[in-house]
């Protein structure tokens, strides 16, 4: 798989930096130079980037932007993340590694059996006393999944690994997602047209703002409350999968979350 290819490719490399990036990403011409400059200026041993996630069609727009709004909220302060003081986070679509630091932590062989190897890379570097930074980057673009089915299965796997053990965070996210929807549905079935309309408008406005903040088209906010229900469903299933140690199939392989 990818980690094995990275391990093979890194053998005998004498350059001071290693770049791990996905083949389906598109980079601005100066992206690598800017990432390297940020690492040198801030004294970082790894720089990872969160790029623009491209989505097409209703299925992808239903789920992907809300997922990234959730991840953005959980990350917290982006300035702290960029300075290397936030959580140990990395995005496998772009990780620039100081070779000596990564080799001191054991290299790619140490994350060969980990489902979320990018997060594991950041965690190992932090555990070894090294500094990792996480940045937003409009110069990195990628379309992660094709259609609703891929997006659903992909984020079920990813969220299981990222959040499955954080029961408090999962419960809080589900409450934020589902309580307004429950209020809207209750008002609708009770014939409270004005209240239901106001709740729907508030939900659409919130969805639009979150989409705008993550670089996606705000007009898809009119999918509310379907987008909130979709995210809640994927998040709940991811948490259950993690609790049960369930095996999920991904690209022909079974992976335990």
Sequence positions of predicted segments:
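Membrane-embedded multi-pass helical conduit in multi-pass membrane proteins
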Residues: 170-246
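Catalytic donor/gating beta->alpha subdomain of glycosyltransferases that bind UDP-sugars
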Residues: 39, 46-71, 100-103, 108-169, ...
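Long helical/loop segments within the catalytic core of UDP-sugar-dependent glycosyltransferases
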Residues: 1-11, 15, 34-104, 152, ...
